[in-house]
Amino acid sequence: MMSSQRALGRAILYLSIGCGVVGISELNMRAALAADYKEAPSLAKEVAAGKLPPVAQRLPANPLVVKPVDSIGSYGGTWRQALVGASDGLLERTIGYTRLVRWDPKWTGVVPDVAESYSVNDDGTVYTFKLRKGIRWSDGTPFTADDILFWYNDILMNKEITPAVPRWLRSGNDPVVVSKVDDSTIQFNFKSPNGMLLYYLASNIGSDILAGSPAHYLKTFHKAYNPDVDQLVKAAGAPSWVALIQAKVGNWQSPDRWRDAARPVLDPWKLTVPYTGTTQVVAERNPYYFKVDPEGHQLPYIDRVTYDVMGDVQSVILKATNGGLDMQAQRLNSLETGMVLAAHREQGSYKLFKVQPAWSNGMLICLNQTVKNPVLRQVFQNKDFRIGLSLAINRDEINDILYAGQSRPYQAVPRPGTALYDEKLATQYTQFDVKAANEALDRTGFTKRDDQGYRIGPDGKRIAFSIDVQTARKDHIDALELIRKYWKAVGVDMQPKPIEASFAVARMLANDQEGLVWIGGGGYDFLGLLDPKWYFPYENQSAFGSAWGIHYQNPKDPNAEEPPAWAKKQQDLYTELLRTVSDEGKLALMRQILAITGEEFPVIGTDMDPDNYGVVKTNFHNVPDIMPDTAFYVTPGPTNPEQYFIK
């Protein structure tokens, strides 16, 4: 675990309240003099031929200086990767991690990126971002505050394009107001405090702003600016101009924006062959990229990035073991695959780097306390029932059989090494103790048993229920089969219900599930703050109390139910957290939420998700030995792929 996680809000996050400004510090050391800027040989040839302006004219006035992981790199080469099918998110993670602000590499805080600096007022209602002067889109067009205004006025606030403003950009029902201070300064104004904006901007969600900002390009597809847009709609085979521009802008949950090679970007590489779901995707260096290394070399070091489009994950694994991938963790990051990769290191001429799951738990068991069946609802809401089932699980056996001994018993709490880790909560009710399990279950009052030894519920019938499990998660299915056996031994009849993931989600959103197993999020500090759904009823995906979570998001929803006092207390604390500017304040509130989680024990954890691995060729450099693995961190984006090099 990253030891620096305990420094959340201190290490590289230089947030000063009031008139304070976040500086770039050591991650943006003074760049070399403009006369000393260096560029890739391929770009130097284009400059000599008059096809490009000199490198000093392509860089902003104050380029972001990236400190290499190990050493100054050399130019050239192709970074080979592989993705699966037509909906893979790998491009967003590897060549698309450019933001107003970004996570620092060790995930200890937020640092500037396209924004040179930022400041926040005392109550967290006004965020001011100073953009880098002279920064340009990949086609050479200047990027200014007007681009952000286009995203705000013509994409976000256009109800045809964006029917509902995302919650992270609202104060209650009031959307953020974005205004231009000058050509290089933008303000985000909220009616009430927004303590989480910087985190969202740095996460996967934050990509949508810059994707919707190349005004000079997107205006061509916008009816307000192009009266002939219907001709483009017809040529593209789109149903409407709205659908066409939505595809151009895309969103963080879909790869649509990567299907357009003409889209200008601020990323280190720009597409030359788009992502159509067949054969290969190709990206080449962006000659206007705004970052340099400490010696003034314009980044990226690597000339070209390719993605072979594969039909399945096994094909990606085979390509890796045969040496066909230069650096990749996505689609390889499972325990079973890690064992295969380790056995073929010499054959594939690669090393392994560790990708540390950001999950709080390898498999959470959620008994739906708002289930529509009133008998099961009464049973599931009894804390002693949940405690008894937890004590009946032999987690060490599950670890040995399914995780090769690489895991350990663990409940649903943030991981060791994080600021929010709590040893007591992590280990409570994890010991395998059949006697104590039966005692807890007896305290429920369900002591009578039928002729097969199963406990009788309040309706006079056997306590029996199903638990939904994704068909794609063989490890979860196998674990649930073991747990079925453990629970039978203490008189509870549980039947695993394998179901395709989309159907499992649909049942959860409709509050139709009796129980559900899922991997547990919120294992890192930022994830606990951004994605707390397993710690309290936060949303409809809080599968242990879906109707309570719906109530928190929208009390008027017909599926919403008033939560019990303990859950309401957690929801109130989280609402306060969202309005809290300081990191210390947010952490203090989250600890209160987690203390209630520990006391009420709403979900049952099994084992901690073990570490996984990616491959990196022996001639591929500046890749950290360890990095977090989650979509919120946008792995490996914050490790600065632009400073990777091949030699």
Features from the language model and the residues they span:
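N-terminal lobe/hinge region of extracytoplasmic solute-binding protein
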Residues: E39, K45-D122, N153
